[in-house]
Amino acid sequence: MLSLRGGSIAVAASAALAIGVVTVALVPAPQTVAASPVAVVTALGNGRETSLSTASADPGSIAAISLPAELSSAEVNTVAQMSRAQLAGQRVIYGYPGLTPPARLLRLIRRGEVGGVIFFSANYASRSQFTQAVHQLEKANASKTNPARGYPLLLMTDQEGGEVRRLPGAPTLSEKKIGAIKPLSAAETAASKAGSGAAANLRSYGLNADLAPVLDVYRHAGDFDDRYQRSYSTRPTVVSALGAKFVRAMQNGNVAATVKHFPGLGAASSKQNTDVAPVTINLSAGTLKNRDEYPYKAAIAAGVKLVMVSWAVYPHLGSKRPAGLSSAIVQGQLRNRLGYQGLTMTDAIGAGALRAYGSTANRTLLAAKAGMDLILGSDSVAQGAQALGGLENAYHTGTLNRAAFRTVVTQILALRHSLPA
């Protein structure tokens, strides 16, 4: 969703990541999948199962693999060494105010209790300052006390294009401007250029994940998404084609893409913002499936690594809860109907839309129960730590299935392994 932070537009990360489950019997040693033109792996977990192929992707890019190029039991072994707090921390994305990573965040990273960090415009003053901050995080992650030290942190931001960019540089065109280009083939070229440009830009800053592209199909001029030109088009076929091009180009550039906000916020009016208050999208199930969810089919086929789920309520999809707290939507729609096998990610856990759902720890528990893999604690390190506490307690008590929990962490590590440090 969209919020203001540090005097600039800040889109709260709303992405849902979920990649299947690695079993110990992945690939017999020696694992040399990268040398094979086609690698097929069965991924299991949280009710998802898929065969993953690398046949059509660019060699050497993260798009070429849905799991690490060298498949082994390394992630499984790493997970087996983790404490409850470390397991919980791998599922939390932290944010922090200001220009310097707080000492508490660095301590948590050194202890192996952080999965990633999100950056906003308020974290940026200059290239040298920002890259120094990234270096501090990377140095902490390399600590010998961190069992996940061999796995790069998920370092992400919202670099959508146009007005919604946290860092200077590409992509300069907004989604709406790209969607207005004629013919469609030219717009597809522009979307690919935006994806590859964003990837190169983020990599130059040391980041490896982007909370983009937006796949919402907006309805009217001035709507929530259209206000900042965050939607490609009112036509789902156009959003589908351009979003998939962006995803492929970005991931060929070794940056994980995140499509959002499933199952769609395109019908939200200019006054409807889940960051601020509850939002209900009163569309029929048929409209949501055939229009709003439509672009996700192509993104999934393109191998998108992450999906962010909306905090809006969609009563005609069988739930009175926000989508990210609803197994009917996360499991029923995204996984079972559309066949998504990747990682899921929440929007900001501190969103106003969740006011009725209690503490950060309780919201986190409800999201995890619904099938959300990564929790976005973007407001502060304290908020991220509260999310960690909720997950740790649920693991300890068995409120969340421990085997499934470890499987999610294994898949998070698999994604991190596939990304450049």
Predicted regions located by residue number:
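Mid-to-C-terminal alpha-helical segments outside catalytic/metal-binding sites
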Residues: G390-N393, T399-A421
